[in-house]
Swiss-Prot record:
It holds the Pfam family Ni_insertion. One of its GO terms (molecular function) is lyase activity. Belongs to the LarC family. This is Putative nickel insertion protein. Keywords: Nickel. InterPro entries: Ni_insertion.
């Protein structure tokens, strides 16, 4: 599986994303012509060296004075450009995310009345259209982003002095569920435009996924920093058998909870969205019998599941083991009909495939097979075997 991984150790801006993707192999001539045909700008692309790292610097030359554009006006510019459908959809999606972020910050529910200042200029339009075209041209199966260095300090903008990250940028970080951190540089390293492009295309990662590097690209930023002001991107070939997924593991010890309470908690955690739950017997200090409760969850479900564990068990706290990058097979549920003792029954079967569609495993749904076993008098193990055989004939 081919993946694009952005590594924003010096932040990200629209022109840095554009430069990075062009350096990775997107067609420079095609993207440049597309930008200049869509927006009243000229584009210069050149190689520079930033603190010892060669990078691609993209300069968008715009008219000296431009009017502030509204959200509908920006959409009109994109639609009038006659872009390829995938590029147009991405550009509109990015501006939609920007609009929602600005609306949330300013308390303006009517997007039609939103005025864009910095992100409404032609250079931002060019960055968004160009980055969308370049990313699509790389033909990746997926796009990811490692933790983002947002910078620190304050910035001056149309609404006055704002903290870093700017409020709209922070909303976009929230929307994309990105990991981010401050830095020693007293500058804005992640711009709203950069954040919006990443939020549209990329999923969050805490660290690089397992895979092999195909190519590396660097997009140059404008400012001179203490380190290289570049956005690093890599095209990687991930393990074709598996698909990346982000999880967190919750864990706590419970030494004064009955089996009935633990059984109920087990069911409720699964109903609330836990990916898996394990309750293990343990011995604590002074020989007290206890249980270790472990829960696998998506990051967005961690807080509510942790609260549920505390409320139900009386535990004083829940450990959240640092987010892990796991690899899993793509799974789907199918129904199959099969014969048992002359009678036709139906059962769900879980089918696992890799990203290339190769069958990895089939597993009959236990609860369905248990009901069939009770009705037919056949051992549940035999019922499961028959269900899986029927599934193999249909889906192999």
């Amino acid at each position: 599986m081919k993946a694009l991984v952005f590594n924003p150790f010096s932040g990200a801006a629209g022109d840095m994303i554009l430069g990075c993707t062009l350096d990775l192999g997107a067609d420079r001539k095609t993207v440049k012509e597309l930008i200049e045909a869509s927006v009243n700008v000229s584009v210069d692309i050149r190689e520079v060296v930033k603190k010892g790292i060669k990078a691609l610097d993209v300069r968008i030359n715009i008219p000296e004075k431009e009017q502030v554009r509204t959200y509908p006006e920006l959409l009109d510019v994109v639609k009038a450009a006659k872009l390829p459908s995938s590029v147009e959809a991405s550009a509109l999606g990015i501006f939609s995310k920007l609009a929602e972020a600005e609306a949330s910050v300013h308390g303006q529910p009517d997007l039609e009345k939103l005025h864009f200042h910095e992100v409404g200029q032609s250079d931002a339009l060019a960055d968004i259209i160009g980055s969308s075209a370049a990313i699509h041209s790389l033909n990746c199966d997926s796009v990811y982003c490692t933790p983002i260095n947002v910078g620190s300090g304050t910035i001056e903008c149309a609404h006055g002095v704002m903290p870093v990250p700017a409020p709209a940028t922070l909303e976009l970080l929230k929307k994309g569920k990105f990991y981010f951190r401050g830095g020693t540089e007293q500058k804005e390293l992640l711009t709203p435009t950069g954040a919006a492009i990443l939020a549209h295309f990329a999923g969050p990662l805490e660290s690089f996924p397992q895979g092999r590097v195909i190519s590396i690209g660097y997009g140059a930023g404008d400012s001179e920093l203490s380190g290289p002001n570049v956005l690093q991107g890599t095209l990687c070939e991930l393990d074709s058998c598996l698909i990346p997924d982000i999880i967190e593991v919750l864990e706590t010890n419970a030494d004064d909870v009955s089996g009935e309470v633990l059984g109920n908690l087990f069911e409720e955690l699964l109903a609330m969205g836990a990916r898996d739950v394990a309750i293990l017997p343990a011995t604590m200090k002074k020989g007290r019998p206890a249980h270790v409760i472990k829960v696998i969850a998506k990051p967005e479900d961690t807080a509510k599941l942790a609260r549920k564990i505390i409320v139900e068990t009386g535990s004083l706290g829940v450990r959240v083991i640092p987010t892990r990058h796991r690899l899993m097979a793509a799974r789907r549920i199918e129904s199959v009909n099969f014969e048992v003792e002359g009678q036709i029954y139906e059962s769900a079967v879980k089918i696992a495939r890799d990203s290339e569609g190769i069958l990895l495993n089939m597993s009959a749904e236990f609860e369905d097979c248990k009901k069939i076993a009770k009705q037919s008098g056949i051992p549940v193990k035999e019922v499961m075997r028959k269900a899986e055989e029927a599934a193999r004939k249909l889906f192999s």
